[in-house]
Amino acid sequence: NYQDWDPVHYLDVAEMTTAVAIGYDWLYDVLAPSTRQLVVHSIKTKALDLVVEEYKTGNADSWAKRETNWNVVCNTGMVLGALAIEEHYPELAKHIIGEAVRYIPNCLKHFAPDGVCYEGPAYWGYTNMYLSLLLKALNDNLGEDFGISEMVGVDKSVLYYMHSTSPSGKIFNFANSGSPSPKPLCPGIPAYN
């Protein structure tokens, strides 16, 4: 019953949509019909309706199109939301998935040639956590990931994480990474290595 999912900071919308979509999928059989309707309505009005306009009018600095972690995180959230309510809004889902697949390479092209994330280890983890969710969801629901996993460097990205971890187990402090503690290896990425 939130008024909105904080569209001013679209990462919040993406994370909320991801959580709600996964919960809706996992709990569908035990949700009351009224709760299902609320979830479908919320995903559509608080996330997907907003992204349609962003794809249409957003410039290169738009979260949907930029070359940073925001692109993968936000587009993944929208794809998961679209897949969750696809049976109710198939054309909307098709449009969102198509646009997300079109723009996600804007970020991932920077993984070429050897999987390095220019934003540093912390954002590597954030980006790849969502990338692994995206690849799994696309493959499970649509039977393909539209070539995203085949982009140059994506298959080597796990090596970047391994090489940016020091012998002490701590992440080297560079780029946008200041964590003194190691981050756990993103669980989904080894499947794509």
Show where each model-derived region lies:
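Aromatic (Trp/Tyr) and acidic
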Residues: P180-N193
